[in-house]
């Protein structure tokens, strides 16, 4: 049976799409339509999802925010090496979570919190779920993001 065109053009977001220099769908591959059933609902990406590389030294911990407007194909799924963190938009800012999880505070200990052999460390979903995040009121999250963005912009101008 033919799948809707949207499913035939579903992109698979892998760790190689998620670099510290930025996020790009150019490296994404198309989903094999026969495997669509193997992806849980949580792996179908939504605007604002955090994508956290969760496997391997050198890639473990890299993070991006998914922007659905940059996906000309519509649908995308995260492969098993990318952990999807979906904020509740009315309560938690994706930008705030991105700034927190990308911070030195988290990144400096991420390998210690991962499991597995030396080269193939894995950041378990249970570890991500149990991570304690300081969560100020929503408006304060937005202020923190604005201040961080201003500081980063100031540094980049130098």
Model-derived segments and their meaning:
Residues 1-3, 16-52, 67:
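Sequence-specific dsDNA recognition surfaces
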Residues 1-15, 121:
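Extended boundary segments
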Residues 63-79:
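Short, compositionally biased
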Residues 88-90, 94-106:
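Glycine- and charge-enriched low-complexity intrinsically disordered segments
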């Amino acid at each position: 049976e033919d799948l809707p065109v949207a499913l035939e053009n579903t992109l698979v977001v892998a760790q190689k799409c998620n670099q510290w220099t930025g996020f790009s769908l150019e490296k994404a591959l198309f989903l094999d339509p026969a495997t669509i059933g193997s992806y849980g609902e949580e792996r179908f990406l939504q605007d604002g999802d955090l994508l956290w590389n969760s496997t391997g030294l050198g890639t473990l911990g890299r993070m991006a925010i998914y922007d659905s407007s940059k996906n000309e194909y519509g649908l995308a799924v995260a492969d098993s090496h990318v952990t999807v963190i979906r904020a509740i938009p009315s309560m938690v800012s994706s930008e705030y979570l991105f700034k927190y999880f990308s911070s030195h505070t988290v990144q400096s200990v991420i390998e210690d919190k991962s499991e597995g052999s030396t080269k193939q460390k894995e950041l378990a979903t249970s570890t991500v779920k149990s991570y304690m995040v300081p969560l100020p009121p929503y408006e304060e999250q937005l202020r923190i993001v604005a201040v961080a963005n201003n500081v980063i912009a100031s540094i980049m101008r130098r």
